[in-house]
């Protein structure tokens, strides 16, 4: 069995290209994305597994772990920035940005830390 790698943000250009490179190198990517139609299309093309999950929702790691437990690595290819003047940025904007770009990545690593040792 080839080594499994979780690819978060697998429907974006970085995530989908990384998944394709891993597959072509003999690894087994497991795709994670929030849009089922898009992730299924990529999964079918690469012949790999996937989970539909939104990293902004509580319990997203538990949802993914129902599909895959043992992994070799994680690629967190999710990111966004809210470009607007500082005077217009609210605390809610900052919290959402931190949750998407940092906290969810930390949760993913924590959720799979035993497998990653």
Regions found by a protein language model. Give the residues of each.
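Conserved Rossmann-fold cofactor-binding substructure of NAD(P)-dependent oxidoreductases
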Residues: 56-70
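Rossmann-fold cofactor-recognition segment
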Residues: 43-59
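Conserved glycine-rich Rossmann-like NAD(P)H-binding loop of the short-chain dehydrogenase/reductase
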Residues: 25-39
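Conserved NAD(P)H cofactor-binding loop of Rossmann-fold oxidoreductase domains
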Residues: 77-83
């Amino acid at each position: 069995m080839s080594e499994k790698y979780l690819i978060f943000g697998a429907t974006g250009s970085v995530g989908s290209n990384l998944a394709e490179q891993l597959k072509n190198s003999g690894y087994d990517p497991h795709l994670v994305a929030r849009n089922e139609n898009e992730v299924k299309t990529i999964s079918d093309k690469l012949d790999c597994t996937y989970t539909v999950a939104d990293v902004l929702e509580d319990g997203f790691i538990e949802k993914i772990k129902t599909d895959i437990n043992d992994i070799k690595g994680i690629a967190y290819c999710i990111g966004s920035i809210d470009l607007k003047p500082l005077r217009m940025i609210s605390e809610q904007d900052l919290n959402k940005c931190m949750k998407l770009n940092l906290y969810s990545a930390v949760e993913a690593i924590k959720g799979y830390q035993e497998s990653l040792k």
